[in-house]
Design a protein with these regions (language model features):
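Catalytic domains of riboflavin
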Residues: 1-236
Length: 236
């Protein structure tokens, strides 16, 4: 079963490819479990993917850390440009999952492979600590840890998965965060869109061809959604 093969790949620190839907973005993302990100993984993502390297988090973690969707942060700023640039015309009809950008404080510029790998792997630890915090005191400790170790703006884009995951939104953020949950890993993935040499997103057929050539699992969003409907996760 492709789902099980994908979970094994994620547990082993290997990437999987996820195509959302022809009726949505129609894009394939390279996906790693954030806890296993290495400089080599970042190199593969930027060279074979080419899109924007982002790290996901469950909405519960965002709530604990006091993070919000970037558009909500802009709205609260009440700066005039926000109204003029409001994203009310996204072609695939969904709110963006983007939140703030971050760098780990031990990075230099934050952009080299090693810097981004450090930022992402350490952020995965924050996600784990936040989800295991079972008191207000422990939550406050995680918030303090986040502030001590990270700064913004940075070179890693964070994404907040919708509450209820796929039941609310069917983007790569939700699809892949759910896969990490299923794999029993820290529920944070690192994702990047695959781009072609024609100035467009890499076609599905070429993404499948790439997966076969590299021995990577290729998953379709519809298969992940089907799994979610039969095995939803509580309290997410």
């Amino acid at each position: 079963m492709p789902i099980q093969e994908a979970l094994e790949s994620l547990r082993s620190g290997k990437p999987v490819l996820v195509f959302d839907s022809k009726d949505r973005e129609g894009e394939t993302d390279i996906v790693f479990a954030s806890q296993f990100i290495t400089p080599n993984a970042i190199r593969l993502m930027r060279k074979d993917g080419g899109g924007l390297i982002c790290v996901t988090m469950p909405s519960k973690v965002a709530d604990i850390l006091g993070l919000d969707y970037l558009i909500k942060i802009y709205e609260r700023s009440r700066m005039p440009f926000v109204k003029r640039l409001y994203p009310n015309d996204i072609p695939y009809g969904e709110q963006s999952s983007f939140s703030i950008t971050i760098n780990h404080r031990k990075t230099f510029t934050g952009i080299p492979d090693a810097d981004r790998a450090l930022t992402i792997s350490k952020f995965a630890e924050i996600v784990e600590h936040a989800l295991s915090s079972n008191s207000e005191y422990k939550k406050a400790q995680v918030v303090s840890e986040f502030g001590r170790n990270f700064r913004t703006p940075g070179h890693v884009f964070t994404l907040i998965a919708s509450k209820g995951l796929i039941s609310r939104r069917k983007g790569h953020t939700e699809l892949t965060t759910y896969l990490a949950y299923l794999a029993g890993l820290i529920p944070s993935t690192t994702i990047v869109e695959m781009l072609g040499d024609d100035g467009k997103s890499l076609s599905k057929s070429k993404a499948i061809e790439y997966a076969k050539k590299r021995g990577f699992v290729f998953l379709e969003g519809k298969d992940i959604i089907k799994k979610f409907l039969s095995e939803p996760l509580p309290n997410i």
